[in-house]
């Protein structure tokens, strides 16, 4: 084959053209990770644009260490872009962020769930709205500072298709929060930090002379001042702070509480009752404002039913998970390693059987699915947990209690 018939070499982002002919929008939060992404792409010769979304402006949160996308962060992103010599734009997404992230977060707590607003933010504001803006600007890709990998996974029908994989730095793995990323979004997104350890990212930031090189990582829920989410929920949804009963699984009323928003499933400390036996929150009955408690074994869960499933396998979900199911690995908490599981789809819904079992699973949490337990495992998507099934005795007691009338 002659040289002129060879395909042009791929650049580092898997495009068949030179970096200087490839426009990339970088989502810049004002933190070290996205700043290093912009710096790396600039060094490699790409046509780089930095965009920062102003998502909220809640007083104390604006200057709180470890916040994201507020006043100080926007200024940090601007200064980084000045250092790198790239254009920087700020888009006001406060209204959109409130509608798609903050309000649903509060509503989820009122419903007795344990929501994950980072998933909603990635799903809507960052990977839907910002991605559309990047396309309007003529960009070939949207790059972010997330710790996750994507690689080409072409098919005859979709030559540009890509797949997601866990990152090299397992301690920084963000795949759990990205399970809802759609296939169309994955094909357009790029994650340059997926193969780097966090320590190397810090080193690169210092080498580039970036003002954010020693900046603290974002922590907890970015839009909540001082990390007190109950203040936000009470303000948006006053009914969440209404008093109710604390009830044992066996039906005994043990005391009262000042609002279900102060409790999470699996909680032991701070329940506010003393019975001489260790008790845990096993269910939040939002309809009747009851906090239901029981022994630790009542938290054990082996099956979770999912809603809003985002499937990223090569087959359709029905083809992969019908019959005997789809053997995979699942994470129901961001800090846990993926554990053996089987995904099923049948007339009762989409559900995951957890081989080992897990304690304290709450509605609203995510269940992310993987090909293997270790680093570099492929991400198959996942869903939000709609409900779970406990061990039989606890499940029967809970159903009987929920079916019983509540005293006026």
Curated annotation (Swiss-Prot):
Sites where the protein binds ATP: 27-34, 53, 145
Keywords, ordered alphabetically: ATP-binding, Cytoplasm, Disulfide bond, Nucleotide-binding, RNA-binding, Transferase, tRNA processing, tRNA-binding
Main location: cytoplasm
Catalytic activity of the protein: S-sulfanyl-L-cysteinyl-[protein] + uridine(34) in tRNA + AH2 + ATP = 2-thiouridine(34) in tRNA + L-cysteinyl-[protein] + A + AMP + diphosphate + H(+)
Stretches for region Interaction with tRNA: 172-174
Residues flagged as site, Interaction with tRNA: 146, 365
Enzyme Commission no: 2.8.1.13
Molecular function via GO: ATP binding; tRNA binding; tRNA-uridine 2-sulfurtransferase activity
GO cellular component, one term: cytoplasm
Compartments in which it is found: Cytoplasm
Superkingdom of this protein's organism: Bacteria
Keyword rRNA-binding: no
Active site as annotated: 121, 222
GO annotation, biological process: tRNA wobble position uridine thiolation
InterPro entries: MnmA-like, MnmA-like_C, MnmA-like_central, MnmA-like_central_sf, Rossmann-like_a/b/a_fold
Chain coiled-coil ranges: none
Cysteines joined through disulfide linkages: 121-222
Pfam families in the record: tRNA_Me_trans (PF03054), tRNA_Me_trans_C (PF20258), tRNA_Me_trans_M (PF20259)
The family this protein is said to belong to: Belongs to the MnmA/TRMU family.
Role played: Catalyzes the 2-thiolation of uridine at the wobble position (U34) of tRNA, leading to the formation of s(2)U34.
HAMAP family with a match to the protein in the record: tRNA_thiouridyl_MnmA
Protein name from the UniProt record: tRNA-specific 2-thiouridylase MnmA
Organism: Rhizobium etli (strain CIAT 652)
Gene field: mnmA
